[in-house]
Amino acid sequence: MAEGLRAPPPPGNGSECPDGARWVLRLLGECARDGRDVGSALLGLLSIGCFAAAALPQFYQACKTGIMDRALSIYFLLGWLGGDLLNLIGSFLANQLPLQVYTAVYYVLADLVMLSLYGYYKAKNWGTGATASINAACLFCLLGTATTLTVLSHDTGPAPNPAAFGGRSLLSLGLEGPGPEPISKTEIIGFAIGSISSVLYLCSRLPQIYTNYRRKSTAGVSFLLFALVMLGNLLYGTSVLLKNPEPGQSEGDYILHHLPWLIGSLGVLSLDVIISFQFLAYRTGQPSAGEEREALLAEHGDS
């Protein structure tokens, strides 16, 4: 079956993306041939804006309430970081769109800050009684930093040239054209890693849903974090779907090539909707963040 993995042929000789939008080519290294491609680039940039802003409300909420270690599940944060790390590695290896690589880099950086805050408040509120959680957070922070620096030390792709926009397609069979280029093993590994990252994204929400249910409270968790992530995932997935397939590549092959990243963005929306309903269900009758923090410290002092 490996013999059937082929990439579409290059679009041919000529100038680099002659009919494309120049600003998209310069900014993202993508060839936007028509309004559909330009719209995809715009939605992708908006999604990055949502992701960039999403973590800020949670950072503020953490500093305001001081109970981030109780409000957020460590397994939610670790699962999120694990998915983002694999997403970054998979995007790089599978020759994904530059926008996907840039978004993955920001994901990891924001996760590292979030885990650092979690470890800080865990140590502050529990002293030496939370060594395992803090060690796990530190380990993942180091792993995330090393992975991000390794990826950033390489180019995310070659300089734009006529063949750079040929794209690659898994299971693209029977394409006409002389000498189709085989899909590399590296790209297949990247596709597999991207698939695993999608599973981690889906599973990461479950511990947070359980934590909210167990506490019967969402105090200390910023609703804007999930609202902006939901909007960002929706825009991100739509931008990938909106983009035209490369010449010689069918719509089905294009979707298959980007499927893990689509599941990782659009697939988690249903779970984020559940968390949004929890904010509505627990908004009345729940203790304030200050009361919960005082109770937490009193409980720790009695132990």
Curated annotation (Swiss-Prot):
Transmembrane regions listed in the UniProt entry: 39-59, 74-94, 97-117, 132-152, 183-203, 221-241, 261-281
Gene Ontology CC terms: lysosomal membrane; organelle membrane
Topological relation to the membrane, as annotated: Multi-pass membrane protein
GO biological process, one term: lysine transport
InterPro entries in the cross-refs: LAAT-1 (IPR051415), PQ-loop_rpt (IPR006603)
GO molecular function, one term: L-lysine transmembrane transporter activity
UniProt-listed Pfam families: PQ-loop
Places the protein is found: Lysosome membrane
Family listed: Belongs to the laat-1 family.
Protein name according to UniProt: Lysosomal amino acid transporter 1 homolog
Organismal lineage: Eukaryota, Metazoa, Chordata, Craniata, Vertebrata
Encoding gene per record: SLC66A1
